[in-house]
Amino acid sequence: MTDQALWAPWRLDYVNTTNQDDGCFLCHYRDADPACDSEHLVIQRGPHTIRLLNRFPYNNGHLLIAPRDHAADLDEVSGEALAECVGELQAWTGRLKETISPDGFNIGLNLGRAAGAGLPGHLHWHIVPR
């Protein structure tokens, strides 16, 4: 599995709707009643971040880590939020290692539509177990 391309045919619904402007789902989930977290796949909230399962995952365990503040670029994110994001990346890769024993991870963010960002206005990290 580790040398396979990152393509998941079940993501086609997402790919076909990426040009629709329905607002920022991360801000919507951030502002929603925490009682709706399971419906929104939110697994944890922090003072500066929100963590959730990807609704259209490449692999099992595909997570998103995002700052609470709507920011398109790293220089728009506070130091506290960046530190919390990096801490959560570390914590969740550790949890995923313990629970699903992946061979590795793809971890990253896409800044801007040209870089492949499906939501270019609100940066977020992907953790994709491989």
Q: What positions do the PLM features span?
A:
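HIT superfamily nucleotide-processing domains
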Residues: 1-130
